[in-house]
Regions:
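S-adenosyl-L-methionine-dependent DNA methyltransferase catalytic core
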Residues: 59-62, 85-285
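Short, histidine-centered active-site or binding-site loop motifs used for metal coordination
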Residues: 8, 39-41, 248
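Conserved Class I SAM-dependent methyltransferase catalytic core
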Residues: 16-92
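Short glycine-enriched, charge-decorated loop/helix-capping segments at active-site entrances
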Residues: 8-14
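Short acidic/His/Gly/Ser-rich catalytic and metal-binding motifs that mark active-site loops
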Residues: 2-6, 244
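Short glycine/serine/threonine-biased micro-segments
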Residues: 1, 76, 254
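Short, solvent-exposed loop/turn and secondary-structure capping segments
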Residues: 5-8, 47, 100
Length: 285
């Protein structure tokens, strides 16, 4: 994914970007009835990657697969996080038009509203308990030269590092693969414990915009803390009993690099229920 991502250099010569064709080499050898390739939205939407998309379609067709390429919003399927991913799906013996219709019709059955961050975190054991231990102790410090946008949560850079504040009464922004240390999202525990109270982050942002304070004058309250591994996993819809291994930084990265589990399950069920039952029943293109 990294070679195609807008977060990277997006170089056509990136060796990692060639792995999408290696994927189809594996398909050619194993001849599965269906396949699913997942990648970043940019591969499906940016003009610079159109030659790659064309090669994927042509190669899959030569291998006898009808295909469709779709971009899905995780929030449309009950995931409490704004995350979009591309899925390239193929099936033997079915036309591409039929693959597309089977997939899109099947997806409709799984659409569900997404919960807010508050709803998700409130269902977990309390922060700092054995069931939700502290996993990031990076101090929350104010940026010396903040960047201000209209919202404290969207676009504004108020704190040191890449960790952004979490808006509790909305879905989470995309959890980054670089989580860990001061790149870990920030939660205001007092606002989580007291619904309806104004977030200090919002007050600070407003005071900066109106010239009533500065980073030198403001004092960060002790209730600002970092998102835990358990909380990040819940926002990615991992099962509660899922075990992550490695250092805390590696655990955060495993979560940030993942496809939300509920979205992955949805795609898998659609392939199982809508495509596998039709493989070979129709004439391929």
């Amino acid at each position: 994914c990294q070679g195609f991502s807008v977060a990277g250099k997006m170089s056509p010569d990136d060796e990692r970007s060639k792995l999408v064709f290696t994927f189809l080499d594996v398909v050619a050898r194993t001849q599965p009835k269906c396949f699913v390739m997942e990648n970043v939205k940019a591969l499906a939407s940016l003009r610079r990657w159109e030659p790659v998309r064309t090669r994927l379609f042509e190669r899959a067709k030569k291998l006898g697969y009808g295909t469709c390429l779709i971009v899905l919003k995780a929030t449309d399927f009950g995931v409490p996080q704004a995350r979009e991913r591309m899925f390239f799906i193929g099936a033997q013996g079915i036309t591409s038009d039929k693959v597309f219709s089977h997939v899109t019709e099947g997806l409709e059955e799984y659409r569900a509203p997404a919960r807010t961050v508050r709803e998700v975190l409130s269902c977990l054991p309390h922060y700092g308990s054995s069931g939700n231990p502290v996993t990031c102790v990076a101090e929350v410090r104010l940026a010396k030269h903040p960047i201000l946008r209209s919202s404290a949560y969207r676009g504004s850079l108020l704190f040191n590092g890449r960790g952004r504040p979490v808006e509790l009464d909305s879905v989470a922004k995309t959890l980054p693969a670089q989580m860990g240390g001061n790149h870990t999202p920030i939660v205001n525990q007092s606002v989580l414990d007291s619904p309806g109270s104004e977030d200090w982050i919002v007050t600070y942002h407003r005071d900066l915009l109106e010239g009533r304070t500065s980073p030198e004058e403001a004092v960060v309250p002790g209730d600002l803390r970092r998102l835990t591994v358990r909380e990040a996993a819940a926002l990615q819809t991992f099962p509660d009993d899922y075990v992550f291994c490695g250092s805390m930084g590696k655990r955060y990265r495993q979560i940030g690099n993942a496809v939300p589990c509920r979205l992955a399950e949805t795609v898998a069920r659609v392939v199982l229920d809508r495509l596998l039952v039709n493989v070979g029943d129709e004439v391929s293109e």
